[in-house]
Amino acid sequence: MPLFKLTGQGKQIDDAMRSFAEKVFASEVKDEGGRHEISPFDVDEICPISLHEMQAHIFHMENLSMDGRRKRRFQGRKTVNLSIPQSETSSTKLSHIEEFISSSPTYESVPDFQRVQITGDYASGVTVEDFEVVCKGLYRALCIREKYMQKSFQRFPKTPSKYLRNIDGEALVGNESFYPVFTPPPKKGEDPFRTEDLPANLGYHLKMKAGVIYIYPDEAAANRDEPKPYPYPNLDDFLDDMNFLLALIAQGPVKTYAHRRLKFLSSKFQVHQMLNEMDELKELKNNPHRDFYNCRKVDTHIHAAACMNQKHLLRFIKKSYHIDADRVVYSTKEKSLTLKELFAKLNMHPYDLTVDSLDVHAGRQTFQRFDKFNDKYNPVGASELRDLYLKTDNYINGEYFATIIKEVGADLVEAKYQHAEPRLSIYGRSPDEWNKLSSWFVCNRIYCPNMTWMIQVPRIYDVFRSKNFLPHFGKMLENIFLPVFEATINPQAHPDLSVFLKHITGFDSVDDESKHSGHMFSSKSPKPEEWTMENNPSYTYYAYYMYANITVLNSLRKERGMNTFLFRPHCGEAGALTHLMTAFMIADNISHGLNLKKSPVLQYLFFLAQIPIAMSPLSNNSLFLEYAKNPFLDFLQKGLMISLSTDDPMQFHFTKEPLMEEYAIAAQVFKLSTCDMCEVARNSVLQCGISHEEKAKFLGNNYLEEGPVGNDIRRTNVAQIRMAYRYETWCYELNLIAEGLKATE
């Protein structure tokens, strides 16, 4: 394998790299015999890195001849201090990287605490040559993510950007134009559904080409194929970057280095807790009017169709029967049925129902059975009741579902400090789905100050194609995105949809990840309009075309002064590691992320880029992974940016406050401290799609700054000692990469 290439040295990946990437993909998906290129084992003591083999390899490589000047340079850097280096007033001549490190903040608001200093930790058990390869690979991987995030107006943290620019020898230019835009909350007395201020029609022409919506000034420009200069993603560049990352996560030295750094991060946090736990607690005790109960926390991953608990649903069914027994609520091909007649048809009476007979709760029977889990969305096993109570498009125009959601929202408002981001479904089966959903939203006036909304797109093209609902995959993409583009260009012609889009913060991609498509996304893959087969495209195929259209859409909406959207897919709950690799490239944040424990390289990259992960241990416990084996605590200790979420309260929770139930169980099982829980709660607010104004209110005016400078303990109840530890540890790991690259100059 050739050495990894830096971005400035050309990005063309040769045939050997592509061939290697295909071999890695095949070995994982087809379960080839022998040793897998991507380790299927947890990153723990059982990680198959042979100690004797590694020691022998290092001993052999160290004895090989190497450039003396480079060796002396590395030897001179064998001591790396954990603490923030000297201040800007130092008279010592510094390199551009050292100048940045030394100008880090001095934390006037952080109490003194005990730090750990590591000496001789320059290459984490890999040879000098391997260390260079590792640093180049990690550097380019971070550059890849930064590129895709900025192009699509998604989030990439400032700190790694500073290190990347200093490695390039450039100054970081603070540019807030790359930030996503969320709709601010309505002012007092202002109608959140107002349509008076909708922008005028731009008159642009739209055309889908190769699965991506292209925007033209007019029809004549469309005929000449002269689109407006928006950042249309380049498929060849994406595939080259994807192949590079596939090769990177399978490289032995990179896996060894990442595995050792992750073990170091875990051990280091445990030492930090042992030394500073009481000092952190002292900070929190001295913080007036703030504790875990009254710091803001957001349910960053919850599905609207299951946002209520089972008792709430049962109570609503009985209440609706008491009030509307003689109301016509359901229609069949033969006749229309009243609510009383519908229950008679199902041979049941609402007053005889219990939470057990409702049978919507996931149990032992759903473990590793996603098909059985989906059946739990049908109360009493009856699809008629699901259509009536949990759907937006039915005979009564989704009135019951809207009422249930309003009641859940009222509970959140009553709790005051809890927020949620429910997902509503767009399937892509027909182009009028958006109009129906937005009409339901606006007509029922579904607004709650403690809720923001997301759109989930189920990956079920194969189902629609087998029933001949769609001619090809491109039509599904067109049904999903074209109405949104049209409403953005001409809001006044689509008032309901334009208002609805103001309340949407992102797109999610959902389905059972354990279903393998066996297809590797490559330059030979059919274009979406050519994908006429009944097989489902791969996860990466779905993700790329969703990202590509969101990127163009965000550029258009940003130009119009409208809110933009994030790409926040379900990822890593099951299935191949290529899902997580794709998310690292193009997703703002993900839900689940369990499979990160199987890839030390991806896990380390998620740490370096601080990619938010919404974890749902109770959901995983019923479907894929026992609670005690959940990597939540391991990820938290290492410093990954994780939050807690409920996923489906109807299936997994029992109480009126499912998010608090999730925190309470995690705190008991994992023995979390108050500071731990408040840190997770703060992460959830940073991860979510609520507006800048609300985040500034909940977290402090400086929340966009990283480290203790951006933490207001009076609002977050997170100790400044913890924030300083997290920031210094993060900078330490980024600095190792910078030092490794500097030594190769």
From Swiss-Prot:
Listed GO MF terms: AMP deaminase activity; identical protein binding; metal ion binding
Disulfide cysteine pairs (residue numbers): none
Keywords from the named record: Hydrolase, Metal-binding, Nucleotide metabolism, Phosphoprotein, Zinc
InterPro entries in alphabetical order: A/AMP_deam_AS (IPR006650), AMPD (IPR006329), Metal_Hydrolase (IPR032466)
Chain positions recorded as Zn(2+) binding sites: 301, 303, 570, 647
Species this chain originates from: Mus musculus (Mouse)
UniProt modified residues of type Phosphotyrosine: 214
Protein name (database record): AMP deaminase 1
A GO biological process held by the record: GMP salvage
UniProt keyword annotation of Transcription present: no
Record field: catalytic activity: AMP + H2O + H(+) = IMP + NH4(+)
List of catalytic residues: 592 (proton acceptor)
Co-factor(s): Zn(2+)
Binding site for substrate: 303, 372-377, 573, 648-651
Residue positions where Phosphoserine is found in the record: 83, 439
Residues modified to Phosphothreonine: 79
Top-rank taxon, per record: Eukaryota
Cofactor note: Binds 1 zinc ion per subunit.
Quaternary structure annotation from Swiss-Prot or TrEMBL: Homotetramer.
